[in-house]
Amino acid sequence: MRNKKTLVVMAGGTGGHVFPGLAVADALKEQGWAVSWLGTADRMEAQLVPKHGYEIDFIDIAGIRGNGLKRLLMAPIRIIKSIWQARSVLKKRRVDLVLGMGGFASGPGGIAAWSMGIPVILHEQNAVAGLTNRILSLFSKRVLMGFSGAFKSGKAILVGNPVRKQLVDLPVKKISSEDVALKVLVVGGSLGAKVLNDLLPAVFSSFDNENFNIMHQSGEGHYQAVQKGYEQRLVKANVQEFITDMASAYDWADLVICRAGALTVAELAVVGLPAIFVPLPHAVDDHQTKNAQYLVSQEAAVLIAQKELTAKKISDYLRLFLQNRKLLTAMSQKSRKAAIIDATESVASICNQLV
């Protein structure tokens, strides 16, 4: 006889899906749940999830939108195959509940669970629900939102975006005083951002080295180019391919220059960190711009569309913040006020209600 409730988390592709899933998984594991993962073997979750102590099963599925006619025509066959693969996994795991957090595996996994009578909880991190989640919401017992308005359905519940406990536990942000260097963190997401990698070394070269302390996450495969960009301009910067301890990086920084993935926006709010957002222009339904607007509307961040991005625009903002730390402090306080810090607990509680 089983004593533990069993959960399969379906989340993958990017850190924006995986890390919120891990936050909920950790919370439920502490409560005695048995948690495993469903994902794809060629995406981030394949390496990241086992490192955090969770078993992962794989199904064969890839994105459909914007990937050409051949893939579109083959999609029904691939989807049916992946649903049967997911059914096999769920049967083997003797699952009580599945939690869909986004990524390629969520759709087939959610439909497989529904077909087996296993309750599905869906969480949409972005301000605009993606295609997979719009479909999966029809098969879900609970539909949860990171941002208000992501779903038009009246049954959708606003819970916020789960973030890691170590971020919630960070002390209240204190912005550096004007007599010391401004600490700037540049993050292009887990995969990097070429436009930030290319532009920021030139931007910082227009200031004295004493003005800024710089930490720059280049993304996988871009370290050497970014490091060279700073060195050629005689700019001191701590360049890292991937920052493994993001809690310490957030705690260190006064300001972030970054994309506007849902997880990034949620994390910045929780830690009270002002931001210059440069949303990914190719994001489906322009959801990153809508994510960023949440903090911009609270006067906790500023936004520069990539098509309007210039070295001068970023330099002007940096000069403003360099000379006006009170403004950054006010933005920090407004950011923290906008945070939903109990999102992880809310999702975990809803999981417990259904089993």
UniProtKB/Swiss-Prot annotation:
Function: Cell wall formation. Catalyzes the transfer of a GlcNAc subunit on undecaprenyl-pyrophosphoryl-MurNAc-pentapeptide (lipid intermediate I) to form undecaprenyl-pyrophosphoryl-MurNAc-(pentapeptide)GlcNAc (lipid intermediate II).
Name of the protein this chain belongs to: UDP-N-acetylglucosamine--N-acetylmuramyl-(pentapeptide) pyrophosphoryl-undecaprenol N-acetylglucosamine transferase
Reactions that this protein is recorded to catalyse: di-trans,octa-cis-undecaprenyl diphospho-N-acetyl-alpha-D-muramoyl-L-alanyl-D-glutamyl-meso-2,6-diaminopimeloyl-D-alanyl-D-alanine + UDP-N-acetyl-alpha-D-glucosamine = di-trans,octa-cis-undecaprenyl diphospho-[N-acetyl-alpha-D-glucosaminyl-(1->4)]-N-acetyl-alpha-D-muramoyl-L-alanyl-D-glutamyl-meso-2,6-diaminopimeloyl-D-alanyl-D-alanine + UDP + H(+)
Membrane-topology annotation of the record: Peripheral membrane protein
Group of enzyme by EC: transferase
Major place of residence: membrane
Gene Ontology MF, one: undecaprenyldiphospho-muramoylpentapeptide beta-N-acetylglucosaminyltransferase activity
Compartmental location: Cell inner membrane
Residues annotated for UDP-N-acetyl-alpha-D-glucosamine binding in this entry: 14-16, 126, 164, 190, 243, 262-267, 288
Alphabetical list of SUPFAM superfamilies matching this protein: UDP-Glycosyltransferase/glycogen phosphorylase
Alphabetically ordered keywords of this record: Cell cycle, Cell division, Cell inner membrane, Cell membrane, Cell shape, Cell wall biogenesis/degradation, Glycosyltransferase, Membrane, Peptidoglycan synthesis, Transferase
InterPro entries hit by this protein: GlcNAc_MurG, Glyco_trans_28_C, GlycoTrans_28_N
Pathway recorded for this protein: Cell wall biogenesis; peptidoglycan biosynthesis
The enzyme's E.C. designation: 2.4.1.227
Signal peptide positions on this chain: none
Family: Belongs to the glycosyltransferase 28 family. MurG subfamily.
Gene: murG
Matching Pfam families: Glyco_tran_28_C, Glyco_transf_28
One cellular component term from this protein's GO annotations in UniProt: plasma membrane
NCBIfam families (UniProt xref): murG (TIGR01133)
GO biological process terms, semicolon-separated: carbohydrate metabolic process; cell division; cell wall organization; lipid glycosylation; peptidoglycan biosynthetic process; regulation of cell shape
